[in-house]
Amino acid sequence: MEQKSTRKVWQDKAYQMEIPELLRAVESPVETGLSSVDVAKRQAEYGSNALEVEKHSSLLEKFIEQFKDFMIIILLAAAAVSLFASHEWHDAVIILLVVVLNAIMGVIQEAKAEEAIDALKEMASPDARVRRNGNVETIKSHELVPGDIVLLEAGDIVPADMRLLEANSLKVEEAALTGESVPVDKDIAPITLEDAGIGDRKNMVYSGTNVTYGRAVAVVTAIGMDTEVGHIANMLAHAEKTKTPLQRDQDRLGKSLTIMILAIAAVTFVVGLLRGRAITDMLLVSISLAVAAIPEGLPAISTIILSLGTRSMAERKALVRTLPAVETLGGTQVICSDKTGTLTLNQMTIEKVYFDGKLQDRSVEIPVDNPLLRSLVLANDSKLDAEGKLIGDPTETAMVQFALDQHFPLQENESRYPRVQELPFDSSRKLMSTFHPMGGEFLLCTKGAPDQLLQRCSHIVENGEVRPLTEEDRKAILSENTKMAREALRVLAAAYQICNAVPDSPRSEEVEQNLIFAGLVGMIDPERKEAAAAIAVAKGAGVRTVMITGDHAETAQAIAERLGILPMGEDNRCHVLTGAELEMMSDEELEKKVPEISVYARVSPEHKVRIVRAWQKNGKIVSMTGDGVNDAPALKQADIGVGMGITGTEVSKGASDMVLADDNFETIVVAIEEGRKVFSNIQKAVQYLLSANFGEVITLFVATLLGWTILQPVHILWINLVTDVFPAIALGMEKAEPDVMQRKPREKSSSFLSNGVLESILYQGVLEGGLTLFIYWLAGQYFHEENLSETMAFATLGLLQLFHAFNVKSVFRSLFNGNPLDNIYLNGAALLSAFLLLGVIITPGINQFFDVTPPSLMQWGIVFGISFSIIVFVEIAKAIFRTVRKQA
């Protein structure tokens, strides 16, 4: 059933309303629930509790969409002209194969991208327990309607957005939706804060989140696309996905080539007519010249180089889902990183411990019979599973793990002190207590908020001795609590008492009194050790790291300082922005503010999208990392979305362009290095192909002006499709240049032709064309045989381009500043292409097809010498460029 947009005012204000007021608005009796008649009416009004997303386009529609790329249009036009005007079907077939291959790759990538929205559907709870017609029923979750009374307990997936009516020690894990790193304590009190963020709505539970502890009764306030997950699905379906830098570069290159090709063809046509040549002849010459100017192999070579990059990245734990993402990573200027699980371990860990009057770090050795360890372990609901893994609330598992690290005999203590009674955690008193038999008496263990627990303590244990708790003790304990809280540690206190008996129905005010204070523990989700070093490397490469999290500002700021995102020892609050503060800003204000902000806290999915978009408005290439459902819209909005392979939801992975197999921020920096290498290698291939094609154009154009017939179409075709292709692919296997991570990221407005590449293409093309024309003239002067002159020009142009492949290993660096033969693939490609070129010239039958004459050994020496000279000329030009750049 299709969902209808009939959202009521009470649905938006449910978290602010008193329960009786809400139930009157909902018209739902809490004890009996809705009747079957009510349910039918509401299903007709509101529709189904399911995510409705736009229908995916068909494979054929996706395939046709790929042909809207400008470079592809140019290639198709070239194929058509080649086939119908000059009847060169070989060229047309090759071009069409290249275009179809690229289209297929694009379809595969788009199909993968749609997985994000599909994965959202898998989050839904299959069933829900509701009160209907005065009975408790189990129904399919898609049958829920607003006003349904739902029963929740530990282990349930919340089936819709709901306002709590009753809550018994309820904790809900909302990390995937809000980014909060620990389960949230829930209660039923109305929220007075206007426009409170979803992370601050303690009386609400949201579709797709997990109940980790306690029980509750709630009323459904939103279903399907009206839920918070539904809003995310809607943002995913309508996320703006801009073209990647590579796609923009190829578009610009295609347009530039079109203008150049049309201009050259027109000038050649007019010049030929002025020289008295026939219109039909000049039309064919112009078409041949235009087709020769197009680097037919560039899209295929780019695809191959990107594919090689994906393989290299996969070996380094970065799994690329879309090919252009490889190159986009290299251009990254800003990394908007989620905190939990990416910059931190997503594992609460005790870092500080206060006992025996001293605050110490976690490395301190604590005796296994210490009351602090015992209380932390016994007043605890976490368990070890069959594989020895701790299961339970992250705060509680952190306590048990700390005890295990201290070699505490966990199983022995559980057997020795079995739990016989308990006072569960309650959000009002913020304590939990358990009772355990101990000889003829009972041991009461209590843990909870330090300020609450300290009020109930009358004694303190130090060095095994119990004494009365003094006012000075209280001040010292609260002082240490404050110190840890300032470091964004979550602080819990532990205490104990010896009882004579256990009440059947224990009451806090009776049993949680006159306790013996045992100590404090401070815990945090710690930063990954390698993350700080990776952030420093990124900074050295000119890449800014920004933290975005659903956690509180104080916690986020502390972690950011420890990671080096913010400087230590300074007042950094001005560089931290909360979701509430962001909400007050217009898009224009945020666009101006983002360069100043390094940490965003308590943000919603909409905020994350706005942050990414604001950076993009500042002209930056943005990477966004995330693992939760709440990250998915921003992942899709970013120039490159980076998901987490271990902790990431299927939704976040589906919205990503790249997935980190190890969830490690360091891997992003490694991938940026690989991306820079890939861009550099594509740039080298572009420089190589365009300088080669420009050299051919110069040769043909000048020859036309001079009335020479220097190269035949079959010669150009052979060089473009054989001689050029193998070295261009091999250039994609070049190693990263030594300073690749010391350079600043390239600007978003830059292109393949920036930073000296265009100048290099022009002068190197002129060199290739000039040397080819020179040998044609030289052969004519000394050997007086037209066919031999054409052959020597053909051989020289081919060999020139093979030698030139080594020149483009670096735009400015000397070829001999290192090992010029360090790329074995380029060496092999050059030898293979040279062998094929030699083969068509000296092999009987084949040389007749190509209309060439085998030169003598001496003539080959001339060809080789002139071809090799391009290395000398380019080395001189590079030296001049380096001198000019230094002086500038």
What positions do the PLM features span?
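Membrane-helix interface and helix-disruption motif detector
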Residues: 782-788
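A C-terminal functional module that forms or caps the active site or interfaces directly
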Residues: 808
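Generic alpha-helical transmembrane segments
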Residues: 723, 768, 791-805
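Conserved cytosolic headpiece of P-type ATPases
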Residues: 1-745, 752-753, 766, 777-781, ...
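Alpha-helical transmembrane segments of multi-pass integral membrane proteins
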Residues: 760-775
